[in-house]
Amino acid sequence: MSVIDKVYYVEHVDRFRVDASKVMSGIKNIASSDGFGIPVLVPQDPGQAGKTQVRAYVQDFAGYTIKTNPVSGSKTVRATPFSSQVQGGNVKLLRGPWNDAYLSELESFDGSGAGHDDQVDASSDAFNELALGINSTGMLEYYRQEAEKLREERKAG
């Protein structure tokens, strides 16, 4: 996704349904295609599993800029800013074979958790990062925050 003169362009969407063990390699292939100058935004689920996943991405994607995005709020709340811009005509798609599946998923999204919503999540996260710069930290900032948490835990315990 990119932005030019307050218009947001969804340039390409890679959609794949694979085992969890193959998700990271699929994302790494996309990152390799995008190049080192494009940051990789990784949503961080709450709890230890989310932290472990982020660490794995940071380690495996050496050389890339990794930005973590702590997930908070419902999917509907996170999707609202993107949805508003879509409804306002400020989001454009580049033509591609992925358009129909992408639009179908966005149109069927109701926030209930039923059905597929990964493309909604990815679009919302990318939009929120570009438009608002919210809830993301670069790799160095992530590790600084983790070190600070450890210091606080040691003081308390």
Residue map of PLM features:
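Mg2+-dependent endonuclease catalytic cores in nucleic-acid-processing enzymes, primarily RNase H-like
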Residues: S2-S112
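Acidic two-metal-ion nuclease catalytic site recognized across multiple nuclease folds
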Residues: A126-G157
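Conserved catalytic/ligand-binding micro-motifs in nucleotide and anionic cofactor chemistry
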Residues: D117
